[in-house]
From Swiss-Prot:
GO terms for molecular function: heme binding; iron ion binding; monooxygenase activity; oxidoreductase activity, acting on paired donors, with incorporation or reduction of molecular oxygen. It comes from Epichloe festucae var. lolii (Neotyphodium lolii). InterPro entries: Cyt_P450, Cyt_P450_E_grp-IV, Cyt_P450_sf. This is Cytochrome P450 monooxygenase ltmP. Gene3D superfamilies: Cytochrome P450 (1.10.630.10).
């Protein structure tokens, strides 16, 4: 059956290559894996296996000029940092971030919503200004989540338990943020919680499949991709559940709600934005993909960093004991701001282990001429090589070294904080459309790591040659090791959390 479908797809790809793959390109260097005499289609097929090396080679050779990478189903124009500095304030009608994200995340299969920045408005206008009022709610739900996800250790055995660190922090983050996104009535619904976490896993596994085979293949064969099928069913369940909640709230307008679903309902401008199914879809998409998955990845990286260095772990634990002298129940926005060592580690961990090689992904909608005369053309997809820039020793001293307290040397100023977006901290994006949820993410990571440090000891179940479980590199994406097993046990002297 697959062969019957593979033949027409193969013919389409061959025609695409003949028509487009051999067209003369504009005069910027193309970074290739294979000799120029061979067809570029071979470079596209092998991009995922060699992406990190190709990006690094292109950056080192053409640091101050654009260069082209041949991805499976697109050309990516990699622009230098000075171009991003010029383009940082350009609006989305000229440089489109939404469609770029749609393409990069197999949007036709994963059904990422296009055409609206409603979620950005909700975070910028409602969530971020309300952080002082929102954080106590988040912390209360996180307290409940720890009781559900980790054993209380009241049997006196104090035994080590085996956990998958990614799944552990994914579940904690899902439970804590659900209350901020869907409110009290639904946030502890176990089916909703499991569906949301599973949707996150299935969506990103589908995206990984797409990056291996290309959007065309993935879209054509989506019905046979198990993770895509499961994610579609989960989306329908959430649309029914949250869509019904939107309609219920409209019928009971005297009720007061203060969550992401409600903010989007109130801020929706167009008829399409206001549809209950669209509101539900957007809430699930942002919750599972933009919040839960990325937070869980960052937390897993940080946990591995601490596990691989006992002195680092103990130094961070002492900081927590000094900041929260009577236990985790004292945690507040101010105490989290006082966690300077942890904040520095978070930023350094993300610098070395970002979610990918690139940020500032955009599709060009209008011709733009840069200061040196180079023109961005409509239809191009552009990005900046954030990992290469932030590990460049000409821009940052000893940039190749992992120094967890590197940013303490800057006296903990706002510009060196984890959540700051700048030319030295590019992985939250850059400019007008930098990640709006980075502030709540920072508090979430600190709250979870703080409690783990104060109340649990942890170590790897098995040794790795480098002591730290190696990252999983898939194309230009970087993931924490999801196969490593961590052992946890409660520390004997901890403050009981009610």
């Amino acid at each position: 059956m697959l062969m019957l479908h593979a033949v027409p797809v193969g013919i389409c790809l061959l025609l695409w290559y003949v028509v487009y793959g051999t067209k003369r390109k504009e005069c910027i260097p193309t970074i290739r894996r294979w000799p120029r005499l061979l067809p570029q289609f071979l470079d596209r097929l092998s991009y995922n296996d060699h992406a990190a090396r190709l990006v690094k080679h292109g950056y080192e050779k053409h640091k101050n000029q654009p260069f082209r990478l041949l991805k499976m189903d697109m050309d990516l124009i990699v622009i230098p940092l000075q171009y991003a500095l010029e383009l940082r304030a350009v609006t989305s009608d000229k440089l489109d971030p939404l469609t770029a994200s749609f393409d990069d995340n197999a949007g036709k299969v994963t059904r990422i919503l296009l055409g609206s920045e409603l979620h950005t408005r909700a975070i910028q206008q409602r969530l971020t200004p309300k952080l002082p009022q929102t954080l106590p709610v988040l912390l209360d739900e996180l307290n409940h989540a720890f009781g559900q996800v980790l054993p209380a250790g009241n049997d006196g055995s104090n035994a080590w338990i085996s956990v998958n660190p990614y799944e552990l922090v994914l579940n904690l983050a899902t439970r804590a943020t659900a209350r901020l996104f869907v409110g009290d009535l639904i946030c502890r619904n176990e089916i909703f919680l499991e569906t949301t976490a599973s949707f996150s896993r299935n969506t990103f596994d589908t995206i990984s499949t797409s990056r291996s085979f290309g959007n065309l293949f993935t879209h054509y064969f989506a019905r046979w991709i198990s993770t895509a099928k499961e994610a579609h069913g989960q989306l329908q369940y959430i649309q029914n559940l949250l869509g019904s909640e939107v309609q219920r709230r409209k019928l009971n307008s005297e009720e007061k709600h203060d969550d992401f679903l409600q903010w989007c309902t109130e801020l929706a401008v167009t008829e399409d934005e206001a549809r209950p199914e669209a509101l539900a879809h957007r809430t699930l998409g942002i919750l599972s993909m933009a919040v839960i998955h990325t937070t869980a990845m960052a937390l897993t990286h940080i946990l591995f960093d601490m596990i691989s260095d006992d002195s680092l772990k103990e130094s961070l634990r002492r900081e927590q004991q000094n900041v929260l002298k009577h236990g985790w129940t004292e945690i507040t926005q101010q105490t989290m701001l006082d966690m300077k060592q942890l904040d520095s580690l978070m930023r350094e961990s993300q610098r070395i282990n970002p979610v990918g090689e690139f940020t500032f992904r955009r599709i060009v909608r209008e011709r733009i001429t840069l200061s040196d005369g180079y023109q961005l053309q409509p239809g191009q997809q552009i990005a900046i090589p954030a990992k290469c820039i932030n590990t460049d020793s000409t821009k940052l001293s000893d940039a190749h070294l992992f120094q967890p307290f590197r940013w303490l040397k800057q006296s903990g100023t706002a510009t060196t904080s984890f959540s700051n977006s700048s030319a030295l901290n590019l992985h939250f994006g850059f400019g007008r459309y930098a990640c709006p949820g980075r502030f709540i993410a920072s508090y979430m990571i600190k709250a979870i790591m703080s409690r783990i440090l104060l109340e649990y000891d942890f170590k790897l179940d098995s040794e790795f040659p480098s002591r730290r479980p190696p990252n999983i590199v898939h194309g230009d994406k970087i993931l924490p090791n999801r196969n490593a097993v961590v052992l946890l046990r409660r520390l004997e002297k901890t403050v009981t959390v009610c």
